[in-house]
Amino acid sequence: MREALRTQRRADLVVGIPSFRNAATIGHVTEAASEGLRRNFPEMRAVIVNADGGSEDGTPDRVRASADGVPTIAGRYQGKSGKGSAFRAIFEAVTLLDAKACAVVDSDLRSITPEWIARLIGPIVRGEADYVTPLYARHKHDGTITNTIAYPLTRALYGARVRQPIGGEFGFSADLAKLYLAEPVWDTDVAKFGIDIFMTTTALARGVRVAQAFLGAKIHDPKDPGADLGPMFTQVVGTLLTLARKYADIWRPVTGSRDVPVIGEISPVEPEAVNASVRVLVEKFKAGATEQDQAWDEILSEDTRDVARKAAETGNASAIGSRFWAKAVYEIVAAAKTRDDTETLARALLPLYFGRVAALIGEVQGLDQAGAERIVNQQALIFEQTKPYLLERWA
């Protein structure tokens, strides 16, 4: 892939698409990206870069066939298998092509439109922002890692209401791409699912200008939080913990939070329903509590352990309420100050995450999207209000 990049003429804009076995959906994503580039940036030279993980289903071929005249580089990335390694290849492409700005979009999107490209890259091109995160309507059972930890913890630590810090679609400047490349993280979970939270946290901690782009509904291949999300959770949380240790001097003085500017008018849209099995979540909570019992003794406070164990024994996930959850998360974050084994810490939190998601499903039952969103924001506010507990344990 690097050889192909070296033979390519320089470009002003790059759209990066990481992929692995996405032949069924990536054609539509590529068509939307190429149309978005042509329609919104006709005077600028653009390249679509597909960084693939070695698909055998013809994924890169679908990209080449769907780009509709926009120059395309599609090939296998180097390094550890994972989304972050694909992003690293895209960052390298931005640098090698001497581009000004880049957008990255997921390869399984069914709701992407050409306007997404304009909203992700446009603020960078116009000099209004250095980093753009997505803002979309998601079903109340979708985005559970975001809703329970990535959003409220990022908001409380760094003081910015970035609603989708691990959304998958981003716009960023060439300078930021170079900064990401220079970080010594590519043998860690950042090479996998830790990449999104690494990008957002680094942007916030470095004080660059951040904006959010409203993209409508996100319709993709959703994941059942009970069935699919264990490895993603440990990678995202492990990365969050490592970064919290690195940037402690940045987040410790932060109080409250500020709004982050939104690009595009926010309009009401109805996302596709996402299934989530409370029964499976409670089973995983109970099994995980048994598995992590010794780790809880080492990491969690006595009060937190007692509530968690009782809830697991009785299968009463509703005991994992917002305030209890915020305290438990902060105990794990505080433990990361003196412990490098962030995977162990993330695994200790995983059963409580399953319990919290089961509880949250109950809390939003019968609510529409707006009502569910209020619950998520109330939880984020509780994280802000409980931050002194983290500072006390960190000291």
Describe each model-derived feature in a short phrase.
Residues 132-144, 159:
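Short beta-strand-to-loop element that shapes/binds the nucleotide-sugar donor at the catalytic cleft/hinge
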Residues 1-4, 22-38:
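Short, well-formed alpha-helical segments that are part of the catalytic scaffolds
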Residues 64-65, 88-101:
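Active-site nucleotide-sugar/metal-binding loop of Leloir-type enzymes
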Residues 113-135:
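Conserved donor-nucleotide/metal-binding helix-loop-beta segment in metal-dependent transferases, i.e.
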Residues 12-14, 47, 198:
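Cell-envelope/extracellular polymer assembly enzymes that use nucleotide-activated donors
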Residues 11, 234-395:
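Terminal low-complexity segments of carbohydrate-biosynthetic enzymes
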Residues 52-60:
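A conserved acidic beta->alpha catalytic loop
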Residues 98-110:
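Short beta-strand-to-loop acidic/aromatic patch adjacent to the donor-nucleotide binding site
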